[in-house]
From Swiss-Prot:
Residues 1124-1241 form the SET domain. The ANK repeats specifically recognize and bind H3K9me1 and H3K9me2. They also specifically recognize and bind RELA subunit of NF-kappa-B, when RELA is monomethylated at 'Lys-310'. This is Histone-lysine N-methyltransferase EHMT1. One of its GO terms (biological process) is peptidyl-lysine dimethylation. SUPFAM superfamilies: Ankyrin repeat, SET domain. Residues 438-450 have a biased composition (Basic residues). ANK repeats lie at residues 735-764, 770-799, 803-832, 836-866, 870-899, 903-932, 936-965, 969-1002. Residues 14-31, 97-106, 371-391 have a biased composition (Basic and acidic residues). SMART domains: ANK, PreSET, SET. Residues 903-905 are annotated as: Histone H3K9me binding.
């Protein structure tokens, strides 16, 4: 199949070039080329013009009138050559290299030998007049360089052998079409046409530095590289095919892969952030009571939440207590009524009636099952029981007898008579949920009907009715149902008092004594339940008991049929491992935990069968213990110790949830209750379905951290509220959804719980509270327990208010560290922004909450330099509000103090505004720019004087702040101060001292431009001059990206790009872009790895817009633009230079060499060659970047013989190997204030070395005047020694 795919890929490449196999071909063609950077490049060119009086090739005159007045050359008025037409027909390979015919010459460039052309417009805007009968060159050469035989250019590192030799360069301007693959066209094909023609001028070009090792690599035959291509083809093809397969995963339906509340969150996160007003309009069309409501059941209509969900979910956070709670006699249905998986269908009629009730401003209270024997026997009288049975029987008889199955497979819980009755009523065609009874429906029932007595008392008086009620559920099991057995046993084991009553009534139990002992249902299987399967979040719900510690299984689920060890335990979705262990009776029916490791009882009715259970979970009937699996006497069982199992796949529960296991015998039925209070508490605290079924906010596989609820009064209050719900029947209250918001804000835990039980939507938003949710209110007040309750009940943890505030923002702004920790651990996003662009870090920094800021930064997901809509960073907010310790913290975390806001103020401006001299000193010690001016021309001294901040004024004056600097209004700091104030006096004195010493002229650094990039860079680049009166250079156009003035035919076809399909940060070895670069060369901070070869830098292929990774992946650095603080300044002897305003670590991206993309032939006719950078193409046409007329700050970077920058070829938006982007990375630690420099290359100095010398000042300078003189002396001495070989011997023989 792989061979067939490869053959099909090759065929598709030959025919259509648009098949997905183009990715495979591109990998096969590009990878060897990326590794072949050291191969020999054929370069050609002509002798260039010299620099205009500046040194190191980066300095020119302030203006160039000839260029400024020249007409611009546009693409529209360019006439294509015949070769260009051929090139359009030729095929372009996926790697960007043209696969044109070998006879095709250079395209899109003016040939120098065409004397029939009388007038041509060059790409630089000049008219190129060429008389047909004259042999003049296209440009009049400068007198200084007319006789220079070299062609200088800045070059890339790793190819010293690629520079053109002076002896091979032609002396005529005539050229012939270049034949690719046949060597240098200029050196072989150019032939003189007349002996009297002028000598062509070769242009100076900056190049990549060449190493000695590069000479050997460059000298290798190209065929050797091609030999290595073959074994890589199959590997690359497989990699590409795998990448394509990863692009087409089979995703399940959204409602099947996530609970509906998760789907709600997943969609509303992005929608809320992008279209807040559209969402608000859409939501407002609903009734106010229905705003934001959603169900926990996928693909269901909106409905109120059910009572059983809230009780069930809080079983994971309540903990058992020892003492009086054990005295309560609670029936086992306390767990099963709320733990079963009842699917309440919301019919249209039901939804309409509920909406009508909501429009009147009230929610229906949840009707607690009256027949539920959770009510303690001590507090419930027989009269109350009779009344309850009458009411429930009335409801049963009123429902029509249809007997149809409605999702019967999902309703097969046999835990209690109450659940059977409810499902029986539902299957009878009852449209209303029996859990929530609208008041008007209850009012319709004006007369009572005979009751079938389906309750705990019905077990004693009417066994026939029990069997009838059980028939509806028995169909859900695949084996013979034990419904009637369970019901009889329930009647036997309901309570201690009932046991005594049952002993006196043998007529009920005497029919079948064997059914008195409950048997397990380990081998019974219940059909799938859509609700439980969805809320299980595709994870196993098993809880393991390992040495008295409980752990959660995190394995994925394959089969969704439900299982449980007994009717006391909830229905579970299990993984294959736990399904097999369930069938082997390794799950204790008493507590529902898997007996994994520790001390257990083991019953062996047969040699090949063993039943595991806890000693205290044995079934007890009439003071006799029995095996809860088979009913055999427990005395026959033996205690075994199972070795500790591998628990690496489990999640250990909170310490508070484990203490219930220390006394696992609390299920002892001799106390009169099959689910006594301790057993109920233990089940609630460790029930596996609670955290599984209520995980609405986190991604798949995220377990809600129940340990986030701290031990304290909130925990005790919650426990008491849950116990009250389980032991008593609360009054039928009618709550308005608005009450949930106020109760959450006031910390009324019990009321919040009751309202959630009643089904009030936890995402209800208050219209008059900026559409804030109860979670906003709880987070704002710091009620962690209520936050946990709301999140577990389905509250959207990232819900946004009208001003786009999230609950995490409210907690951070109000300094509730515990709430912040809980929300982040529960999955809240830390980087959303509110309507003003502020994150939670901005809000906390503004208020000075040190601990919150420290925790947010330690989380690792927060950007310490994030800016809001005003451009203000957390550092600026902390500075303005005088939070000194917070400023120190942010500075230690890497905060950039020179980031400018929208008005180009830096932190020092805001320190002057606030008047905090301590922060100002900290900022100045961190090398903050004291002379920075904002958009109004104000320096920090201006602002301090205007705000009358005397201490700051004195501090700035002591640091030599310019008191004479004028802003755009023409005001000096002295004029900004209040007349005769203390600040005015200090400024006046400073000015007088300066004026009193006119004989000591001090060079004052003046800011001649606040940003030479005019805002095109993310970080402004100021220009200063402290040497002379030269203004900021204006004889060029600043551009932040490469530009063209003539067609270059760069292959930007997105289908030709090789791309990755990474889901991580692209740091793994499987990233396709990293493989093209041999590996990802960036670390997590965006710096080059230490093993990066600075001498011969490899090609770097960054991730592009065709990749599936995120925009902030690790393999995107250069495309993020300028990040370092740079400054253009006037040097003493090298014209303009560039220096850093901050410390730049090793391997940091500094800037990119940006200019005009031109061809090699076009570079030969350019008059100014000081800004040419050779792109070092290996095959075919050679291209250059000319920063003379268009460029960025890198055009001012001077040469240095010990460079602190190295140029690297990088590919981003395209992968055309002819046009790499040149990125400068630091080769060592660059100190703040240090001048930047890179090695121009030998080719540049071969031409320019005769015009000027290098003045880098390095001890290893190779191109200084002294080094040049030494080389000339050595060169002159060698011929002399060769001409007189016997001079030394003759002198020795001379007696004189």
């Amino acid at each position: 199949m792989a061979a067939a795919d490869a053959e099909q890929a090759v065929l598709a490449k030959q025919e259509t070039k648009q098949d997905c196999c183009m990715k495979t071909e591109l990998l096969r063609e590009d990878t060897p080329m990326a590794a072949d950077e050291g191969s020999t490049e054929k370069q050609e060119g002509e002798t260039p013009m010299a620099a205009d009086g500046e040194t190191n090739g980066s300095c020119e005159k302030s203006g160039d009138p000839s260029h400024l007045n020249a007409p611009k050359h546009t693409q529209e008025n360019t006439r294509a050559s015949p070769q260009e037409g051929t090139n359009r027909v030729s095929r372009v390979a996926e790697n960007g290299v043209s696969e044109r015919d070998t006879e095709v010459g250079k395209q899109n460039h003016v040939t120098a030998d065409d004397f029939m052309q009388t007038s041509v417009i060059g790409s630089n805007g000049y008219f190129l007049n060429k008389p047909a009968l004259q042999g003049q060159p296209l440009r009049t050469p400068n007198i200084l360089t007319s006789s220079l035989p070299g062609h200088a250019a800045k070059t890339l590192p790793g190819g010293a052998s690629k520079c053109r030799t002076l002896s091979a360069l032609p002396q005529t301007p005539t050229t012939a079409p270049t034949v690719p693959g046949e060597g240098s066209a200029d050196t072989e094909d150019r032939k003189p046409t007349a002996s009297g023609t002028d000598v062509r001028v070769h242009r100076a070009r900056k190049t990549m530095p060449k190493s000695i090792l590069g000479l050997h690599a460059a000298s290798k035959d190209h065929r050797e590289v091609q030999d290595h291509k073959e074994p890589k083809e199959d590997i690359n093809r497989n990699i590409s095919e795998c990448g394509r397969q990863q692009l087409l995963p089979t995703f399940p339906a959204l409602h099947q892969s996530l609970p509906q509340n998760q789907c709600y969150m997943a969609t509303t996160k992005s929608q809320t952030a992008c279209l807040p007003f559209v969402l608000a309009a859409a939501v407002s069309r609903k009734k106010k009571r229905r705003m934001g409501t959603y169900s926990l059941v996928p693909k269901k209509k909106t409905k109120v939440l059910k009572q059983r969900t809230v009780i069930e979910m809080f079983k994971s956070i309540t903990h058992s207590t020892v003492g009086a709670k054990g005295e309560k006699a609670l029936d086992d249905s306390a767990l099963h009524v709320n733990g079963e998986s009842l699917e309440m269908d919301s019919e249209d009629e039901d939804s309409d009636e509920l909406e009508d009730d909501e429009d009147h401003g009230a929610e229906q209270a949840a009707a607690f099952p009256t027949e539920d024997s959770r009510t303690s026997k001590e507090s419930m009288s027989e009269t109350d029981r009779a009344a309850k049975m009458d009411g429930d029987s009335e409801e049963e008889q009123e429902s029509p007898d249809t007997g149809e199955d409605e999702d019967g497979g999902d309703e097969s819980d046999l835990s209690s008579e109450s659940s059977i009755k409810k499902k029986f009523l539902k299957r009878r065609g009852k449209t209303d949920s029996p859990w929530i009874k609208p008041a008007r429906k209850r009012r319709r029932r004006s007369r009572k009907k005979p009751s079938s007595m389906l309750g705990s008392e019905a077990c004693k008086s009417s066994p026939g009715s029990m069997e009838q009620a059980a028939l509806g559920d028995s169909a859900g099991y695949m084996e013979v149902s034990l419904d009637s057995l369970d019901l009889r046993v329930r009647g036997i084991l309901s309570s201690q008092t009932e046991n005594e009553g049952l002993a006196s009534g043998p007529d009920v139990l005497g029919t079948d004594g064997l059914q008195e002992v409950p048997l397990c249902s380990c081998r019974m299987e219940t059909p799938k339940s859509r609700e439980i399967s969805t809320l299980a979040n595709n994870q196993c719900m098993a809880t393991e008991s390992v040495d008295h510690e409980l752990g959660r299984c995190t394995n994925s689920v394959v089969k969704y049929e439900l299982m449980r060890p007994s009717n006391k335990a909830p229905l579970l979705v299990l993984c294959e491992d736990h399904r097999g262990r369930m069938v082997k009776h390794q799950c204790c029916p008493g507590c529902g935990y898997f007996c994994t490791a520790g001390n257990f009882m083991e019953c062996q009715p047969e040699s090949s069968i063993s039943h595991r259970f806890h000693k205290d979970c044995a079934s007890r009937v009439n003071n006799a213990s029995y095996c809860p699996h088979c009913g055999e006497e427990a005395s026959k069982a033996k205690e075994v110790t199972i070795a500790k199992a591998d628990t690496t796949s489990t999640v250990t529960l909170a310490p508070g949830q484990e203490k219930s296991l220390a006394a696992e015998g609390r299920a002892d039925t001799t106390t009169g209750s099959i689910a006594g209070a301790p057993e109920d508490e233990r089940s609630q605290s460790t029930a596996p379905q609670a955290p599984e079924c209520f995980d609405p906010a986190g991604p798949a596989g995220l377990v809600r951290p129940t340990s986030g609820l701290s031990q304290g009064p909130g925990k005790e209050t919650l426990e008491s509220a849950l116990i009250a719900l389980d032991s008593e029947k609360p009054k039928k209250l009618r709550f308005h959804p608005k009450q949930l918001y106020f109760s959450a804000r006031q910390g009324e835990l019990q009321k919040v719980l009751l309202m959630l039980v009643d089904g009030i939507d936890p995402n209800f938003k208050m219209e008059h509270q900026s559409k804030r949710s109860p979670l906003h209110a709880a987070a704002e007040a710091g009620h962690v327990d209520i936050c946990h309750m709301l999140v577990q009940a389905g509250a959207n943890i990232d819900t946004c208010s009208e001003d786009q505030r999230t609950p995490l923002m409210e907690a951070a702004e109000n300094n509730h560290l515990d709430a912040v920790k809980y929300l982040i651990k529960a999955g809240a996003q830390v980087d959303p922004k509110d309507a003003e662009g502020s994150t939670c870090l901005h809000l906390a920094a503004k208020k000075g909450h040190y601990d919150v800021v420290q925790y947010l930064l330690s989380n690792g997901q927060m950007d310490v330099n994030c800016q809001d809509d005003g451009g203000w960073t957390p550092m600026i907010w902390a500075t303005e509000y005088k939070h000194v310790e917070l400023v120190k913290l942010l500075l230690s975390k890497g905060s950039d103090i020179n980031i400018r806001d929208n008005e180009e103020n830096i932190c020092l401006h805001w320190a002057a505004f606030s008047g905090c001299v301590d922060i100002a000193e900290i900022l100045l010690a961190a090398k903050c720019d004291l002379h920075a001016v904002n958009i109004h021309g104000d320096s920090p001294l201006h602002i301090a004087a205007r705000e009358n901040r005397y201490d700051c004024v004195v501090l700035f004056l002591s640091r030599d702040s310019d008191v004479t600097l004028k802003n755009k209004e023409g005001e000096t700091p002295l004029q900004c101060a209040s007349l005769s104030s203390q600040v005015w006096s200090a400024l006046q004195m400073s000015k007088a001292l300066r004026d009193s010493a006119p004989d000591k002229p001090v060079a004052v650094e003046k800011t001649v431009s606040r940003d030479i990039a005019r805002g095109y860079e993310r970080i402004p680049i100021p220009c200063v001059n402290a040497v002379d009166s030269e203004l900021c250079p204006t004889n060029y156009k600043y551009v932040s990206q490469n530009c063209v003035t003539s067609p270059m035919n760069i292959d930007r076809n997105i289908t030709h790009l090789q791309y990755c399909v990474c889901v991580d940060d692209c740091s793994s070895s499987t990233c396709m872009c990293g493989q093209l670069s041999m590996r990802c060369w960036y670390d997590k901070d965006g710096r080059l790895l230490p093993e990066f070869n600075m001498a011969e830098p490899p090609l770097i292929f960054e991730c592009n817009h065709a990749c599936s990774c995120w925009r902030n992946c690790r393999n995107r650095v250069v495309q993020n633009g300028l990040r370092a603080r740079l400054q253009l300044y006037r040097t003493q002897d090298m014209g303009w230079g560039v220096r850093s305003l901050q410390d730049i670590p090793l391997g940091t991206f500094v800037c990119e060499y940006v200019g005009e993309l031109i061809s090699d032939s076009e570079a030969d006719v350019r008059e100014e060659d000081s800004y040419l950078f050779d792109l070092d193409n290996k095959d075919g046409e050679v291209y250059c970047i000319d920063a003379r007329f268009y460029g960025n700050v890198s055009r001012f970077i001077n040469h240095h013989c010990e460079p602190n920058l190295v140029p690297v070829r990088v590919f981003m938006s395209h992968q055309d190997l002819r046009f790499p982007r040149i990125a400068f990375f630091s080769t060592r630690l660059i100190q703040a204030g240090e001048q930047l420099g890179f090695d121009y290359g030998e080719r540049f100095w071969d031409v320019k070395g005769k015009l000027f010398s290098c003045r880098c000042g390095s001890s290893k300078c190779r191109h200084s005047s002294a080094a040049l003189a030494q080389r000339q002396a050595s060169a002159a001495q060698e011929p002399q020694e060769n001409g007189l070989p016997d001079t030394s011997s003759a002198a020795a023989a001379d007696p004189l």
